[in-house]
Amino acid sequence: MNVHRTKLLGASAGVFLFAIIYGWVIFPKILRFMISKQVTLKPGTDIRDLWSNTPFPLHFYIYVFNVTNPDEVTAGGKPRLQEVGPFVFDEWKDKYDLEDDVQEDTVSFTMRNTFIFNQKETLPLTGEEELVIPHPIMQPGGIMVQREKAAMMELAAKGLSIVFPDAKAFIKGRFMDIFFRGMDVDCSSDEFSAKALCSVFYTGEVKQAKQVNQTHFLFSFLGQANHSDAGRFTVCRGVKNNKKLGMVVKFADEPELAIWPDGGECNNFVGTDSTVFPPGLKKEEGLWAFTPDLCRSLGAFYQRKSSYHGMPSMRYSLDLGDARADESLHCFCDDPEDLDTCPPKGTMNLAPCVNGPLIASMPHFYNADPKLVADVEGLNPNEKDHAVYIDFELMSGTPFQAAKRLQFNLDMEPVEGIEAMRGLPKLILPLFWVEEGVHLNKTFTNMVKYTLFLGLKINSGLRWLLIMLSFVGLGSAGFLFYQNSDSLDITLPPKIIKETNNKVADSNKPNEPPHFAADTSIPGTNPPNAKSEKRERY
């Protein structure tokens, strides 16, 4: 009986230890190993196919700030803004000219973004709405000449007056013309100042301009970026080291940028190309990606737990930080040694990146210096509409949903050399903001659900079942040991009564019945057996 109880106890303890070790140590390691072998950019894998040609479009929203009092602003007044949008586009991402380097475990490719107007989702807007915005060539051009080539201001002012006759600081145009179809730039004049101005169009320095013929160009914010080269990347494939999956090694065939001063950390590539992330990240590491539009790597950091279609995930968020307060961001200042040259909190100076007086921020200056909001009318920053967020599953490296939001602003200032710009106020004027959003549908979430989470649920159920069974076994063994100890027979030893020879002492004692020694035999009788007593348990 004791052998069975001992076996039951040992087996139960073994099951308990197995459930703990397998459920919390061995199985997660096996699962991570299996994921690491599947999630690579090796040719022929499902991940490679999904990564190179995204099988679904992202949602791309554009919101434009219509200036309702342009004449007042031209005279130095406070801008009043009206947000118009969203104008909705389907954004398709693909990668072409892929070249693998097996030895370095990298793949090089050219990124391409294609925007297709989604008229149905844009309703009631049509894209033909007339909007008033700062002149997209005169204002940036005049400001940059004043800052960097003041000696050429007279020549530039004359050229602008010829190429854009009767131009004002603000222009009116249709949304699709401003952003995609383009606004006409007439470079047909033989005047020297006009030719000098137009030379930057012919040389390709104005990347937003498309040459139509020998003398005319079309300028738009996004037209040239549509279905065209968005940069040449080299990233890690993650075959040799899964932790480096998607990490940017080169951009434009360069191992680092040469944009920011002092060759500091700001020129380094940190993170992926934003279309893939390595599996098995720790939440404290953050999600980093290089963004060519900003010439910068941005990191999103853990905020809280979240869920998507019933699957647990982690919510990450980001902002542009405060270059003055954060020493690691000092290299984004014009002069890292002079903090007065740093952009305001929550903004980033894009001039070194785009060669124009542009400032990046979160929409409506969310999480930025409150003065920026106070300088204009019509802004209402809030987390729900304007924060950047990502709901991310760490083990598989899957972003379930995300909203990448960014606002572009004009770093406006008066320009003495151009009559139409002399009275402008000095402030940061919002132009437009965009949102690039993704929400995985059931087809792709089910791939994660039935490969990852189903296995995790089975493992969780199995380990708790084994733990419960081990507790039942331990309890049963304990009960059997207890029951056995409760029925033990204990034989009491006989009492020995010694006879004394001290007569004097005995005479002083009261009369007592005679005592006989327990081991003394009475003639003619047999000694009785010692009685057994069952000890009662108290």
Curated annotation (Swiss-Prot):
Keywords: Cell membrane, Disulfide bond, Glycoprotein, Membrane, Olfaction, Receptor, Sensory transduction, Transmembrane, Transmembrane helix. Residues 1-7, 482-538 are cytoplasmic. This is Sensory neuron membrane protein 1. It comes from the Eukaryota. Glycans are attached at N66, N213, N226, N441. GO terms for cellular component: cilium; cytoplasm; dendrite; neuronal cell body; plasma membrane. Its main location: membrane. One of its GO terms (molecular function) is scavenger receptor activity. Belongs to the CD36 family. Plays an olfactory role that is not restricted to pheromone sensitivity. One of its GO terms (biological process) is cell surface receptor signaling pathway. Disulfide bonds join C266-C331, C295-C353, C333-C342. The gene is Snmp1. It comes from Drosophila ananassae (Fruit fly).
